[in-house]
Amino acid sequence: AIDLIRQSGGDAQIWKTGHSHMKKRMAEVDAPIAGEMSGHIFIADDFYGFDDALYVAIRVISQMVRTGQSITDYVDTLPIQHATPELHIACADNEKFPFIDRLAAHVKTIYDGKDLTLIDGVRVRTTDGWWLVRASNTEAALVMRAEGNCKDALDRLVKDMEAVLAAAGMNWRIECGLESAVSLS
């Protein structure tokens, strides 16, 4: 989504997950719209942080009527991305943020700063796509995701993420109860 927003002339920014973080950031940068991977979409209509699924649906339908394009036709124009499901790894509340700090310190030694975002966990961007590991704000867990521009790219990203996590002291496949042969793409 970030690449698509930027290609369309928008100023896409990565920020912390969570309703209160999003509302505050929208006000700080005067953003007309914001969204999260969870599907929450925030629209700035007379105030910041208007998060209402029915309202968003009405806005999408209104846009489709204005343009004369069906939502199916619009979705068909979007690039196909390959992504893992959101993985939650049990991690004690008092351990998850220190682990993210250790992971960030390790990742800084591997990746160039322009390929690394440390706003809400550790997000690494490569030519294949991106991967993210962050501490959950709502449960005693780490949350992991990866998205690639093709299946092979996603497989490479997952292997990269796995290697980096192992170097930081975590075999996430064991933690998640997955065997090493399991493909997440």
Give residue spans per PLM region:
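Phosphate-binding and adjacent anionic-ligand microenvironments
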Residues: A1-S185
